[in-house]
Amino acid sequence: KEGYPVDWGNCKYECMSDAYCKDLCVDRKAKSGYCYKLNWFCYCEGLPDDSPIKTNGHCRPGGRRK
């Protein structure tokens, strides 16, 4: 699957570089990832089905974990 990876607080990961997002996504067993520069959040492609991605729901800061 693909989408915006989230932390434990359901918050997307902000970014400025593709390298940061690629590392973050690969750590989550994705095939690749990049910084989607229209909104400055990491986007992953090829994630496992059980990997959490952004859906409906609010971000609850304090759950940030790489």
Swiss-Prot record:
Tissue: Expressed by the venom gland.
Disulfide bonds: C11-C59, C15-C35, C21-C42, C25-C44
GO-annotated biological processes: defense response
GO molecular function, one term: toxin activity
Cellular compartments per GO CC: extracellular region
Classification via SUPFAM superfamilies: Scorpion toxin-like (SSF57095)
InterPro entries: LCN-type_CS_alpha_beta_dom, Scorpion_toxin-like, Scorpion_toxin-like_sf, Scorpion_toxinL, Scorpion_toxinL/defensin
Family: Belongs to the long (4 C-C) scorpion toxin superfamily. Sodium channel inhibitor family. Alpha subfamily.
Annotated function: Alpha toxins bind voltage-independently at site-3 of sodium channels (Nav) and inhibits the inactivation of the activated channels, thereby blocking neuronal transmission.
Protein name: Putative alpha-neurotoxin RjAa16
Lineage of producing organism: Eukaryota, Metazoa, Ecdysozoa, Arthropoda, Chelicerata
